[in-house]
UniProtKB/Swiss-Prot annotation:
May regulate T-cell apoptosis. The gene is Tcaim. Residues 216-243 form a coiled coil. This is T-cell activation inhibitor, mitochondrial. Its main location: mitochondrion. InterPro entries: DUF4460, DUF4461, TCAIM. The keyword Repeat does not apply.
Length: 505
């Protein structure tokens, strides 16, 4: 029996190089070295995927809609766990999605042929502990483009991606006949093509401007309805704000507000507990680390009602969390513990409190003498990675770290941190001025940016925009992102580092 098993394993050992090639195929050459991806950047990078599988587009196909809803929930949990500080390992997660397609394509490994209904099933298993590798694996599994992810890997210290994938240092080169026979794309040929023909802002707006205007005009009645519903609910429940975690379309947002409005008509009393709060429509219900009330878009009214009824308990936990932050601040010389939504994983209040409690207990056990107000005015966030000073001026501190060396590191970098914070404030003022100037010059209805776009990137983008003459932008909604896209409601997305002039020949 043992001999049979050995023979069986030897039979397939020659496939190991093929596995390494598959990893190379999934990860483009420009990502051989890359940095850690933030949660906001991951969501942004996966936008083409979310658009292809969103349940709203499967209204006439309830079975496929349900499959996508359940898979999106599991994917959301996987991605959030991947970003949590101190995580050790994740169980492999098998997911099935139905992908919308306009035209039929040949089936490939792991995919079923396109059905007559205009979608196909895709199955894949997530097992990577690296967020960037996971994002690329999802996009490639669904035959979606990955080129827009390249711009997410600039201006940051790189780390070898091979650690997450087990890839060899030496890239595997295949003869052109291999690509001709298999039908795979030659990455070197694609790279050469991109270098020859590069999209410019003017050419892209010229090709997509009219279509965006049409979509925007069609969405105007729903946009007015959205504003009306938002104002009515904010006034009725005395809310601070209503927001959305993801880039859902206007119709989807209206549907969510109608649902909340019906719940308020049926049972107003529990909802009044949210007075003064910000409501965020997201993937799961609860309270966020920032204290926002999260309404899961896949949950039914019963779940929402239970959440509103339990808000007093959450408010109590908020008070305990604030006290815990003050205690940590005292032990670390007056530094302020903050949660920055754009730079940290999406944590619930319970998860964030548990993280703070773990960090506090570690400080307590070290018995390191507190240094009163030596770090007053500075900020820190809890993260997964080694201690570092962010360009915005805050410290990134791992939840599990040696308190003595931690304090020494922060004292050494304190002066640099203060200088970074002063630069950040000046940069923010410049950014706001440039946004206003750009909005006026191009008569934009709205100019905004993705959460993953830094102030420095936004400033660079707006400065260059102000040097251009772009009549296509009149009356439009313009979003500064990492790639070109026309959203379903007519918003124009452009990369912050857009190219000007004629396309390169």
């Amino acid at each position: 029996m043992l001999g049979s098993w050995r023979a069986f394993s030897e039979m397939f050992c020659h496939l190991r190089p093929w596995r390494r090639f598959c990893l190379r195929k999934v990860l483009p050459p420009w990502l051989h070295y890359s940095r850690a991806l933030s949660g906001a950047e991951a969501i942004n990078a996966l936008r083409p995927f979310y658009f292809a599988v969103h349940p709203d587009f499967f209204g006439q196909h309830p079975r496929e809609r349900e499959v996508n809803e359940n898979s999106l929930k599991r994917l959301s949990v996987y991605l959030e766990n991947l970003q949590k500080p101190g995580f050790k390992s994740l169980k492999p997660t098998q997911l099935t999605f139905y992908i919308r397609e306009k035209t039929a394509q040949n089936s490939s490994e792991g995919q079923e042929p396109v059905s007559t209904t205009g979608f196909r099933a895709v199955r894949f298993t997530l097992h990577s502990s690296d967020l960037l590798s996971t994002v690329l694996y999802i996009l490639n599994s669904c035959s979606l483009p990955v080129e827009h992810v390249q711009s997410l890997n600039t201006n940051v210290h790189s780390q070898p991606l091979k650690e997450a994938t087990g890839m060899p240092d030496r890239p595997i080169k295949w003869h052109r006949s291999y690509y001709s026979f298999t039908g795979f794309k030659d990455p070197d040929e694609d790279l050469e093509h991109v270098s020859r023909v590069e999209t410019t802002l003017t050419s892209w707006l010229g090709s997509n401007g009219k279509g965006a205007v049409k979509k925007l005009k069609n969405s105007l009645p729903l946009r007015k309805e959205l504003d009306r519903l938002k104002n009515e609910l904010s006034e009725l429940l005395q809310l601070s704000d209503i927001r959305w975690q993801r880039g859902w379309g206007v119709a989807h947002r209206c549907s969510q507000l109608h649902s909340l409005s019906r719940l308020a008509q049926q049972n107003l009393e529990p909802l009044q507990n949210a007075k003064g709060c910000t409501i965020v429509f997201t993937d799961r219900s609860g309270m966020s680390a920032l204290g926002h009330v999260m309404l899961g878009t896949m949950d039914v009214h019963h779940h929402w009602t239970r959440l509103f009824e339990s808000l007093p308990n959450y408010f109590d936990l908020q008070r305990r969390m604030s006290a815990l932050e003050d205690q940590i601040s005292h032990l670390l010389g007056g530094i302020q513990v903050v949660y920055i939504e754009e730079l940290q994983p999406a944590l619930t209040l319970d998860e964030y409190y548990s993280l703070l409690d773990t960090f506090y207990n570690q400080l307590q056990r070290s018995r390191a003498p507190p240094r009163p107000q030596s770090l007053s005015g500075l900020q820190m966030i809890l993260s997964r990675y080694a201690p570092s000073l962010h360009e915005l001026g805050h410290f990134n501190i791992p939840a599990l770290s040696d308190p003595a060396s931690l304090q020494s590191f922060m004292r050494t970098k304190a002066q640099q941190a203060r200088e970074n914070m002063r630069r950040r404030e000046k940069l923010k003022v410049i950014e706001n001025e440039l946004i206003q100037a750009s909005t006026r010059k191009f008569s934009l209805e709205k100019l905004y940016k993705e959460p993953s776009i830094s102030s420095r990137q936004m400033v660079d983008c707006c400065k260059r925009l102000l040097e251009q003459s772009l009549p296509y932008l009149h009356g439009m909604h313009l979003c500064v992102s990492h790639f070109y896209s026309v959203m379903q409601d007519g918003d124009l997305c452009i990369p912050w580092n857009w190219k000007k002039g004629e396309a390169m020949k």
